[in-house]
Amino acid sequence: MAFNLTSKYEPTGDQPAAIKQLVEGVERNDPAQVLLGVTGSGKTFTMANVIQQTQKPTLVLSHNKTLAAQLYGEFKQFFPENLVEYFISYYDYYQPEAFMPTSGLYIEKDLAINQEIEKLRLSATSSLMSGRRDIIVVASVSCIYGIGNPEEFRKSIVVLHKGQQINRNKLLYSFVEILYNRTTRDFTRGTFRVTGDTVDVYPAYADIAYRIQMWGDEVESIQMIEPETGKRISEQKSLTLFPANLFVTGKDSLNNAIHHIQDDLMKQVQLFEMEKRYGEAKRIQERTEFDIEMMRELGYCSGIENYSRYFDGRMPGQRPFCLIDYFPDDFLLVVDESHVTIPQIRAMFGGDRARKTNLVEYGFRLPSAMDNRPLTFDEFESINTQAIYVSATPADYELQRSEGAVVEQIIRPTGLLDPQIFIKPTVNQIDDLLDEIQERIEMGDRILVTTLTKRMAEELTKFLDGVGVRTRYIHSEVKTLDRVEILRELRLGVFDVLVGVNLLREGLDLPEVSLVAIMDADKEGFLRNVRSLVQTIGRAARNSNGKVIMYADKITASMQQAIDETSRRRATQLAYNELHGITPITVNKSKDEIMGQTKVADSNKFNKQYIEPEGEPSLAADPVVAMLNKTELTKMIDRAKKDMDKAAKDLDFVEAARYRDEMFALQKIIDSK
């Protein structure tokens, strides 16, 4: 099936020339190109057109999960008839296994897996193995971490056809071999159940299940069903069932792996004993023999990824298989916000190796654990045959690798200009910020505020919320799907101000935001260098009333460079608009479009806490609230009631109860006045 781009827009501004140049580069087999596009210039739409014209399977690599979710939503809208998948780390919480030699402290691995994201990861690998070429996978840098051998995954696929002859027990055994569990109670993803001649199986990567009805040893019918009710959706001629886990292996491979593990265990024990390190020898023998016994009994063990080299048939030091190995050889790599993503990829290997060296050295793991790792940067480059680096501020690496093949996209299709920048002193900055926020709220716009520290973000959020400004705070500890939900609510107007530290820079599509406030803009460092400032300024570039305020007592070199570059682009854009008679307009997305772009958030149905609670009720306990007049307090009660009603409507009764208690506490303050 071919890619079929669906959009009500046509390429305009710099887009047609950019698309033409990039497509020509791909067709010439140029190994690398750079798309230097300003915020809001439609870089994602440009890349969608390149994918449409080149018809290549594409991996879109993003540096954070929030941006990956947004890109996933946009590509789903552009290509509704094609396969668009999402592949990020599935850990809500992850504490890696580690050993601290100085204190003798061993830390067990601890983790919490997000089942919805695990489903999406399996869906991505299953789609890649389906043979279709019309596939886009949006991934975070977790895609360079080791996963199962794609050949083992492919060999484990179960294919059934209506009328096929197969023994029922053999069919059930084939499900068990690819890590599906038989159940008589809860029918969940990755399980199957048997009732007489009827077998129901719930794929680990889907939201629907299948019913296989047997007549003796013949597959009489295959039906797609609703998992919860068993209601038939449609009749199927065939069923292709992919494994329930990325680390799947056949029985022969398992037995062969155990044999090699035992050989390496013997060598490691002998090495420790020669060095008279008997404690380490005893530890590695006990731990490894326990793992081997688990593998023999269950087919897997805790930490089985540390033995992945044996299952994959790799030599020591040989790179692991990763998501990229599931792609065809001629795939196209798009590195979004490459100035941040590339350094992330560089850093992955070193941090992983340092931790595992101690585990091997002190007898907690065999040396094979060192080969369960992310790719080195050289390995990543070796399998990255054709790349397009996308950034408003490309770094030296991308510019050098592309050998000057830089495609500029400065003109926005909407005619929008880079925002005006104002510098204000830090004296009375909070009062000034509050005035600016109120002005923007009256216009129906949203506001982003970026601070240098988490503590300042917390305090500012509490203050703004306390004086009646609907504010949320986003930070690195907020779960991935919750972040997407927060951004969705900002865009839909559930609240007006979003405060953050380092999550409000690259790539976020927020046309409703007309004001970006940068606190402590003159504090040179990672969060206030030229690239960071240009990216942060860009958050206000999708709105015709875009404005940036830098609160600073001096103009640093980074500030000046960011202001100069923004002014250069703004002048180019103004000249283009005057030449073509274009009036800048904000492209406000409809509610349906916003819901579609943030669709991945719908996977998450759990309670959300955006501001860390410090006692109940949070607002009424704030001393600022006690100083407000009755009119302001009444407004806060009305707002709390609306929030309570909304929470109750969403069946979020814990949150509804919190708002109810807040209302009662605020009413007590009014009564006491």
Swiss-Prot record:
Keyword ATP-binding attached: yes
Segments forming domain Helicase C-terminal: 429-591
Ranges of residues in domain UVR: 634-669
SMART domains: DEXDc, HELICc
One Pfam assignment: UvrB
GO-annotated cellular components: cytoplasm; excinuclease repair complex
Annotated binding of ATP, by residue: G37, V38, T39, G40, S41, G42, K43, T44
Family annotation (CDD domains): DEXHc_UvrB (cd17916), SF2_C_UvrB (cd18790)
GO biological process: nucleotide-excision repair; SOS response
Gene3D superfamilies named in the record: P-loop containing nucleotide triphosphate hydrolases, UVR domain
Keyword Amino-acid biosynthesis: no
Protein's cellular compartments: Cytoplasm
Renumbered ranges of motif Beta-hairpin: 90-113
Keyword field: ATP-binding, Cytoplasm, DNA damage, DNA excision, DNA repair, Excision nuclease, Helicase, Hydrolase, Nucleotide-binding, SOS response
Assembly notes: Forms a heterotetramer with UvrA during the search for lesions. Interacts with UvrC in an incision complex.
Family: Belongs to the UvrB family.
Free-text domain note: The beta-hairpin motif is involved in DNA binding.
Function: The UvrABC repair system catalyzes the recognition and processing of DNA lesions. A damage recognition complex composed of 2 UvrA and 2 UvrB subunits scans DNA for abnormalities. Upon binding of the UvrA(2)B(2) complex to a putative damaged site, the DNA wraps around one UvrB monomer. DNA wrap is dependent on ATP binding by UvrB and probably causes local melting of the DNA helix, facilitating insertion of UvrB beta-hairpin between the DNA strands. Then UvrB probes one DNA strand for the presence of a lesion.
PANTHER family registered for this protein in UniProt: UVRABC SYSTEM PROTEIN B (PTHR24029:SF0)
Protein name: UvrABC system protein B
Organism: Cytophaga hutchinsonii (strain ATCC 33406 / DSM 1761 / CIP 103989 / NBRC 15051 / NCIMB 9469 / D465)
